Amino acid sequence: MLPLKESVIESNKLDVDYHIALHTNAGGGSGSECYYYKDKAFASSVLNSFDSYHTFPKRGLKDGSHLYELKNITAKNKPLIEFLFHDNKTESKFIQNNYNLLAMSIVESFLKIK
């Protein structure tokens, strides 16, 4: 795992079309959410795919223009998904037992690209 600034530098060096920031949330909440910067279509696809796999609260899409990672990545599509709360026991267990669903939600989003 790279530190945040290094991750941004490496992603930009690769000149990629997609940069997907995979996160889990903390702070005593519950549910999934996804941040976007400028282009929300792919972020929406990732979040909707993941949300179809769980019954936790769906916190929706959020403007990520204040987030360092999203502001500084040059890729056009750069969702930052918070896959649930790792400090919530039930959600943490779901993440640990269903990490394949996290990956599948991203794969499904790529398959929907026209």
Where are these regions (language model features)?
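Active-site-adjacent substrate-binding region
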Residues: 38-63
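Catalytic-core regions of hydrolytic enzymes
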Residues: 1-41
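Extracytoplasmic/secreted proteins, especially bacterial periplasmic and envelope-associated proteins
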Residues: 6, 15, 41-49, 101, ...
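A generic "cationic amphipathic patch" detector
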Residues: 24, 32-33, 47, 59, ...
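Active-site-adjacent mobile loop/cap segments within catalytic or ligand-binding domains
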Residues: 14, 18-21, 25, 62-114
